[in-house]
């Protein structure tokens, strides 16, 4: 018996059975318990979801922006009313501590929907005078049906981030959550329907990468928004272009640098570094896993980091006192342990952790100890590749020019941060760092108002912020002639 029973697809405002005849399992990563069997969508199911979305989108786009705004605000109210229920499901599905999901995942998702609900009425065109009796005006019109493909680390937050601007602009969305964490996207669909979103405007299809490929290549989908790894992102972009020149937004991986200068407040710097590496058990795309520390303060900084690592409370995710849970799956555990062994083999000095936790109740879950490596080099695998787990690499530097060059020596460019008391240096360094999301004397916050996205191979386009609405609309230009038409022939 599973905890949540059989999970179906959500199409046309309600649950429907998949036609594939296939299911997959989702497990609690803390206990190994079967949470649910989930029906996998077929090509016919994807077609049905897209057709339903087309029908719903026509009704949704015909509403006034104020009507759409009110409905989205109602969805926000429902998300907040059901915060505890949704957080409990998210904790079971992802392994995140309940204190984290209660305070972050649903809260930040609802904030983004509220933000775009407020902007729905601000989507405007321009009027451009040409001459006394002629002018041009522009309209921002919805794209139509968009596809959203989510990642497993922030299931409901990512679903909110992708749907909010799409729906605010009058689009519909067919969403595929990660098959590793498939549960809460269905709850979001229920909430949208209860709030008054027309049937079909938000549909959920379940499955692995093959279902994502069906969405990406579908001729009736106008845009794909994808969150995931770089190599998968390249495939998404290629298929989206080859199929119908779809617009794409992609938030991909990172290997982000955190630079601690010699004048930094060491307690603050250590707090930031620990948060930037061990929040959500290190499974955050923006984590600052390359920690560059000025040589003169490296030993003192490292000692403060290790003191804080000892205070991390690893435990059952459902316990309120826990602030560090398991990794999301056995596959992710194996990947992280492989990187740890690579770090040892390449000569990094293991300062903390480095092992799987197996004592007591840890034995049935996917737990790895918070891990810190010192004496790291830029050419090490743990320094160059995204691990997506709780592994910090500490590197030392001597000069600002040197550390900026080393920090930028990567094909990633998602995030970066500096810790310094010198405001001029802080801004100078940030302006030279090749990253789309940057922090000064802090780390990790991504409010609704802040555009989120990467440079280089860390992504295309942005999520959140006003600019994102531009990528869910298309501009129509209209010339109006009030005077006499002068024929050419």
Swiss-Prot record:
A molecular function GO annotation: betaine-aldehyde dehydrogenase (NAD+) activity
Residue sites binding NAD(+) per the record: 150-152, 176-179, 229-232, 253, 285, 386
Active site location: 162, 251, 285, 463
UniProt pathway annotation: Amine and polyamine biosynthesis; betaine biosynthesis via choline pathway; betaine from betaine aldehyde: step 1/1
Record PTM Cysteine sulfenic acid (-SOH), positions in chain: 285
The protein's name in its UniProt record: Betaine aldehyde dehydrogenase
Tagged with keyword Oxidoreductase: yes
GO BP annotation list: glycine betaine biosynthetic process from choline
Organism this protein belongs to: Burkholderia cenocepacia (strain HI2424)
Gene it is expressed from: betB
UniProt catalytic activity: betaine aldehyde + NAD(+) + H2O = glycine betaine + NADH + 2 H(+)
């Amino acid at each position: 018996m599973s905890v949540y029973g059989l999970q179906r697809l959500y199409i046309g405002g309600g649950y429907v059975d998949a036609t594939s005849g296939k299911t997959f399992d989702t497990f609690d990563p803390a206990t190994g318990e079967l949470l649910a069997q989930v029906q996998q969508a077929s090509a016919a199911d994807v077609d049905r979801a897209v057709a339903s979305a087309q029908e719903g989108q026509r009704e949704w786009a015909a509403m006034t922006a104020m009507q759409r705004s009110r409905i989205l605000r109602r969805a926000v109210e429902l998300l907040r009313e059901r915060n505890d229920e949704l957080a409990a499901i998210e904790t079971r599905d992802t392994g995140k501590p309940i204190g984290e999901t209660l305070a972050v995942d649903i809260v930040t998702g609802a904030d983004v929907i509220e933000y775009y609900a407020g902007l729905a009425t601000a989507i405007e065109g321009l009027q451009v005078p040409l001459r006394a009796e002629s002018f041009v005006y522009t309209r921002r019109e919805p794209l139509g049906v968009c596809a959203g493909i989510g990642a497993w680390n922030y299931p409901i937050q990512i679903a909110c981030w992708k749907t909010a601007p799409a729906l605010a602009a009058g689009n519909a969305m067919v969403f595929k959550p990660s098959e590793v964490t498939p549960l809460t996207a269905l709850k979001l669909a229920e909430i949208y329907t209860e709030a008054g979103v027309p049937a079909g405007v938000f549909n959920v299809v379940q499955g692995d990468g093959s279902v994502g490929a069906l969405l990406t290549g579908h001729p009736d989908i106008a845009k794909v928004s994808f969150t995931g790894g770089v190599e998968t992102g390249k495939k998404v972009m290629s298929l989206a272009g080859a199929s119908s020149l779809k617009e794409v937004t992609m938030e991909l991986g990172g290997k982000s640098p955190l630079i601690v200068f010699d004048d930094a407040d060491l307690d603050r710097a250590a707090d930031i570094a620990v948060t930037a590496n061990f929040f959500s058990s290190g499974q955050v795309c923006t984590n600052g896993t390359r920690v560059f520390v000025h040589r003169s303060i490296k030993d003192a900084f490292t000692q403060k980091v290790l003191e804080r690592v000892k205070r991390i409370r690893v435990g059952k995710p459902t316990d309120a006192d826990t602030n560090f849970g398991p990794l999301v799956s056995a596959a992710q555990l194996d990947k992280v342990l492989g990187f740890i062994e690579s770090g040892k083999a390449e000569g990094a000095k293991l300062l903390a952790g480095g092992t799987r936790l197996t004592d007591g109740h840890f034995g049935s879950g996917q737990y790895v100890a918070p891990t810190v490596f010192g004496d790291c080099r830029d050419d090490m695998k743990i320094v160059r590749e995204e691990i997506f787990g709780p592994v910090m690499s500490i590197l030392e530097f001597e000069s600002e020019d040197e550390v900026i060059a080393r920090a930028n020596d990567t094909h990633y460019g998602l995030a970066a941060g500096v810790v310094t008391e010198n405001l001029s240096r802080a801004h100078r360094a940030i302006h030279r760092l090749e990253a789309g999301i940057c922090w000064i004397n802090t780390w990790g916050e991504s409010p609704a108002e802040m555009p989120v996205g990467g440079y280089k191979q860390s992504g295309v386009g942005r999520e959140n912020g006003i600019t994102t609405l531009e990528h869910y609309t298309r501009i129509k230009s209209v010339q109006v002639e009030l005077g006499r038409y002068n024929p050419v022939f």
